[in-house]
């Protein structure tokens, strides 16, 4: 049996993007549990609400690839008139902007929180490294001082004239 290819690429995805997809998935799943299409206020001035139904494969491809406008009309749109495809693209852009606005208004910005946590962890790790290096530096200074004292103690003995026993 041949393996099917994945509908998306396995590239690195930023944490904020994953969080956004996760939130969208939670919204869709909660609408399925409630027995119908999901209706949500997107936070725009008119209080307009959009109805979301299940995602089709073209929408998933659009979410994962984020293609330019030409690719959207060629890959995910059925043959329509130019006006209808432009209005559909505008609607998708409005939905995307609405989701972004909703996340910003709700105060959920996971990338910043995660980023701050990572920065804090890295800062703590760097502080530990600095402390270890300072201890090592102090130990090496003490070793240098000890060796310097040892050299100074042996130097007077080495200044005596050497006697060549073969000449006698």
Curated annotation (Swiss-Prot):
GO MF, any single term: protein heterodimerization activity
Stretches assigned to the bZIP domain: 98-161
Top-level taxon of the source organism: Eukaryota
Predominant place of localization: cytoplasm
Annotated InterPro entries: bZIP, DNA_damage_induc_transcript_3
Keywords assigned by UniProt, alphabetized: Activator, Apoptosis, Cell cycle, Cytoplasm, DNA-binding, Growth arrest, Nucleus, Phosphoprotein, Repressor, Stress response, Transcription, Transcription regulation, Ubl conjugation, Unfolded protein response, Wnt signaling pathway
Biased composition annotated in UniProt, kind: Polar residues: 30-43
Region called Disordered, residue ranges: 30-168
Record GO cellular component, one term: cytoplasm
Stretch list, region Basic motif: 101-129
Record field: compositional bias (Low complexity): 74-87
Sites of Phosphoserine modification: 14-15, 30-31, 78, 81
Keyword match Ligase: no
Region (N-terminal): 10-26
Region (Leucine-zipper): 133-147
Region (Interaction with TRIB3): 10-18
Gene Ontology process terms (BP): apoptotic process; blood vessel maturation; endoplasmic reticulum unfolded protein response; ER overload response; intrinsic apoptotic signaling pathway in response to endoplasmic reticulum stress; negative regulation of DNA-templated transcription; negative regulation of myoblast differentiation; negative regulation of transcription by RNA polymerase II
Coiled coil: none
Family: Belongs to the bZIP family.
Subunit description: Heterodimer. Interacts with TCF7L2/TCF4, EP300/P300, HDAC1, HDAC5 and HDAC6. Interacts with TRIB3 which blocks its association with EP300/P300. Interacts with FOXO3, CEBPB and ATF4.
Protein name: DNA damage-inducible transcript 3 protein
Organism ancestry: Eukaryota, Metazoa, Chordata, Craniata, Vertebrata
Gene symbol of the encoding locus: DDIT3
């Amino acid at each position: 049996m041949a393996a099917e290819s994945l509908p998306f690429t396995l590239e690195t995805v930023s944490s904020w993007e994953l969080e956004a997809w996760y939130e969208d998935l939670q919204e869709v799943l909660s609408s399925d549990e409630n027995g119908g299409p999901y209706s949500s206020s997107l936070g725009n001035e008119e209080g307009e609400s959009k109805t979301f139904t299940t995602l089709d494969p073209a929408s998933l491809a659009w979410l994962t690839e984020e293609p330019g406008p030409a690719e959207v009309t060629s890959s995910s749109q059925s043959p329509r008139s130019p006006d209808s495809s432009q209005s559909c693209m505008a609607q998708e852009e409005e939905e995307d902007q609405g989701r972004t606005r909703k996340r910003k208004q709700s105060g959920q910005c996971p990338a910043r929180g995660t980023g701050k946590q990572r920065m804090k962890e890295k800062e703590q790790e760097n502080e530990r490294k600095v402390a270890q290096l300072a201890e090592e530096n102090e130990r090496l200074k003490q070793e240098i001082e000890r060796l310097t004292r040892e050299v100074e103690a042996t130097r007077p003995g080495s200044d005596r004239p050497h006697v060549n026993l073969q000449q006698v």
